Amino acid sequence: MLPDFITVPSTSEKCLSPELLLPNMDENLEDSKPSSLKYQKAMMSRGTCPSNCKVCRHSATGYHYDVPSCNGCKTFFRRSILDGRKYTCLKMRKCLSGTEPVDLSRRMCRACRFEKCVEAGMNPSAIQADMKTTDGELLRKEIMIKQKTAVDFLNTPQVIMSFEDKVQGIIGKLTVMELKIEPLYTGGLPPGNRDIRKLDELIDAPLILSYDEIPNLKYCPSVDELTGEIKPSGACYIHCGYLASIEYSKMFDFAHKIDVASKATLIKHATIMCADIMTAFFSYYQRKSDRLIHPNGMFAGPPKYRYGEAGTKYQASMQRTLATVLRHELNRIEYMLLKAIVLCNPAVSSLSISVQQIIGKEREEYVRTLLTYCLLNYGSVHGPSRFSALLAIMSVLESQQKNAKDFHLLAKATILKDAVRYTRISNLYEQIMES
């Protein structure tokens, strides 16, 4: 079912630009008004004779009852008001629609003609004659009230948030969030330093957007014996990806409405997936690479010299998210919305019903925004399929998360079991992997 605020465009033309292609909101708003509210009394100059009758669109003979009209429509409106006549249309009330003059060789629908007189703004109080019946007086008052209501409506400031405002507002918010947390991932830790904090220290801590603000960084460099320089490492960027995802979660509205235990549960479930899609999108969008690559240029994945054949197979499987991103040519807006949907997952087990409702409400906003964006950019034909394809990426992320946890446990139980010395990525990494 489509969201309430979505209007499906009629075009099916595909547009790959991340810019929003939004319909003319003035036209949509005008079409959405009831016919009785389309009336707007025009301020007309009495110095010139109008060209066309506002009712039948034939030549006008002057201003009659404040509206440019012909003698026939003037007389019809006057007689209808004086007699208090009410008419019924048998053809969907569209007999006088269009822009061409009405065919006078055929009998004109009286109901549509009278409605057109009222919409054009003919003023019943300008009729200088006594009402013939009580019905006439009632009809005159009814028309005057309807027209006054319409004028009041048109003169009242309307505070209307269109779906354009909704979409652009949410996308703008996510863009700001991404710009804030991206340096946490792309900048990396200072060479030779490690973040030794654990998950429980991070969850309820204030938002940190710079590594200068991280307390108690531990300096423990891995030095190359030949050159004496600190060895480049991709491991710190894995930690940085997880850290950026956790800090990212603190900027959502739900973060201030749920308890610490619920935050921990949600973070344990979503951090790996958020970090994976961030790494994949960075490799594709920033590095233009068809392999997962860290910001320092090193390829992602366990080193072959230590993990052997198992590591090689796992490294190949890690590319699935990137391959999916490449196949769908994900743009930045789609990436941001998809990552927000991944994080805001109310279906995580052990969350209370009240917490699920809070998270679910926020997730619904991002799902609706993504659907709206797809419909507006890809049209009513390709939009729904694009939306479905983007959501299908979530199943790839969930599969990748399971594979990552399985490989981590396998490596600790077998490959690294008898290792004399190996460097753990971080306490945070191990806690997330083993959760």
Curated annotation (Swiss-Prot):
Keywords assigned by UniProt, alphabetized: DNA-binding, Metal-binding, Nucleus, Receptor, Transcription, Transcription regulation, Zinc, Zinc-finger
Transmembrane parts of this sequence: none
PROSITE patterns: NR_LBD (PS51843), NUCLEAR_REC_DBD_1 (PS00031), NUCLEAR_REC_DBD_2 (PS51030)
Domain NR LBD: residue ranges: 194-430
Domain of life: Eukaryota
Major localization class: nucleus
Protein location: Nucleus
Gene Ontology MF terms in the entry: nuclear receptor activity; RNA polymerase II cis-regulatory region sequence-specific DNA binding; zinc ion binding
GO terms, biological process: cell differentiation; regulation of transcription by RNA polymerase II; response to starvation
One Pfam family, short name: zf-C4
InterPro entries given in the database record: HNF4-like_DBD, NHR-like_dom_sf, Nucl_hrmn_rcpt_lig-bd, Nuclear_hormone_rcpt_NR2, Znf_hrmn_rcpt, Znf_NHR/GATA
Family from the record: Belongs to the nuclear hormone receptor family.
Cited function: Orphan nuclear receptor.
Protein name per UniProt: Nuclear hormone receptor family member nhr-136
Organism, as annotated: Caenorhabditis elegans
